[in-house]
Structure formats: structure tokens, C-alpha cells
Amino acid sequence: MAVITKIEVQKRSKERFNIYIDKGQGEEYGFSVDQVILIKHGLQKGLEIDEIELGNILYNEEVQKAYLQAISYLSYQMRTKQEIEDFLRKKEVGQAIISEVVSKLLHDRYINDKEYAVLYTRTQSNVNRKGPTVIKRELLNKGVQDLIITHSLQEYPKEKQIENALFLIEKKKKSYQKHSFLQMKLKLDEMLVRKGYSREVIQICLEELKDEKDDEKQQEALHYHGNKYYEKYKKHDGWTFENKMKQALYRKGFSIDEIEIFLQMKREEE
């Protein structure tokens, strides 16, 4: 049995208290608690506490400490239930305490995976223009249930997906001006897959791109690569030269007809 002999406010935090006790051998420092625990257990000078009660006090103090760590972690941005659990595990908090903290956070509505998934979907689609496949994968990695994700993705209709994909195409295609039209389409296709768009949305967007095919830019790209390969292979003669040129330009996405026209032009220049 111990008797509380003194309670003092900590210098660095007005919400934490040092508790001094006497176990029969004079006053000594016992433990420190948060204000919430002080009030919850009715700690005051002269109160007698046994070992069982002391254990309860210290356990609840650990729960409160972990709870405040979680609140601080949440102050930067919303988190999922799993993210909070992972964070506390890294802080070496025991599973029993983690479960209590998470239950309290859920009760106090500091964490709500449904709300998180909806807001995350809106942000990633509107700001970062990610496709639904990537958004779903990221939410799964954050521990959000599949059913909740399916519901949140209803916030991202196909029309919006197409709008975003076309924006990404318009932004990216400028960097592919020296590529053939076919090669540019392949690279844009790969980019949209990485961004998380479905095959259906990608095909719709690339069909619109087909209508914008710029013959002048296609010729510029053909001449750019053709002249580069011409310098590389001109040391070869006849069939070997033409075969290497055709293979190289075909791999770049140019049609056989386009390649033949270019080679004919080079013959006429010689």
C-alpha cells in the first residue's frame, strides 16, 4: 500500500503531473500522469493506492500517452485505421493498448475509413489525376476494405476519367514530338496504364488522338530519325544499308510506305 504525499505540475507541461508517494520509508517519486488520468482516478494528496490500483493507473496512462501520439499523428492529415495501427506499432506500443486507442479514435470520429476513402478519391482524381486502378491499389495498401473503396470510386465517373486522361495526353504528347505517331500512341498508352486508367478509357482517348494526327509533325519525326540512322548506316552499301534503315525506322513506329518515301528522297539527294 502506498499513500500519495504530493502532486506537482511538471515544468514543461501544465497538463502532466508528478506523483510522489510514501510506501512506509518516506516520500519518493512514484510516477507521472496526464491530467486526464489524474481526474479519472481521482488522484489527490492522502489517497491510498494498492498494487492493483497502481497497475490500472499506469496502464491507463500508457493508453492515454498512445492516444495523444495518435492525435498528434492525425493533426497533419487524415489517416486510416491501419495507418494509425502501423504508426503505434513503430512506436513499440503493445497490441492491447493499440486496440483501445483505435476504439477510442473511432468512437470520437477521429478516424473513419469511409470518409477517408471518399476524400482520398476526390483529391487523387481532381488534383493528381490518377486513374481508379491506382487509387484502389493505394487505398488497399492503406488498409481500406474493398467494399468501401468500391463505394468511394463512385465519386469518380467515367466522364471524369476521360477528361483527366485527355488532359494527361495533351500535357505529355509535347515531349514525344520527335517520335512517330504510332510510337507516341504506345508511350501514351503505357503512361495511362501506369496512371491507373482502364483499357476502355485509354482506347476512347487514343481514338480522339487519332483524329488529331499531324502529318507535318509525323514527317518531321521521320526526317529526324531517318537522318540520324542514315548517318549511322551510310557506311553500308545497297541491300544491307536499306535493310538496316527499314528495320530501325519500323521499330520507331513508321509505316513501310513512309520509310520507302524517305529512302527514295535520300536516293534522289545523292
Swiss-Prot record:
Cysteine pairs bridged by disulfides in the record: none
Keyword annotations from UniProtKB, A to Z: Cytoplasm
The UniProt record lists the keyword Cytoplasm: yes
InterPro entries associated with the record: RecX_HTH_1st, RecX_HTH_2nd, RecX_HTH_3rd, Regulatory_RecX, WH-like_DNA-bd_sf
Keyword Membrane (UniProt): no
Family per record: Belongs to the RecX family.
Location of the protein in the cell: Cytoplasm
GO biological process, one term: regulation of DNA repair
Gene3D superfamilies named in the record: Winged helix-like DNA-binding domain superfamily/Winged helix DNA-binding domain
NCBIfam families according to UniProt: PRK14135.1
Protein source organism: Bacillus cereus (strain ATCC 14579 / DSM 31 / CCUG 7414 / JCM 2152 / NBRC 15305 / NCIMB 9373 / NCTC 2599 / NRRL B-3711)
Chief location category: cytoplasm
Any single Pfam family the record assigns to this protein: RecX_HTH1
Function: Modulates RecA activity.
Protein name stated in the entry: Regulatory protein RecX
Domain of life: Bacteria
HAMAP family named among the record's database cross-references: RecX
GO CC list: cytoplasm
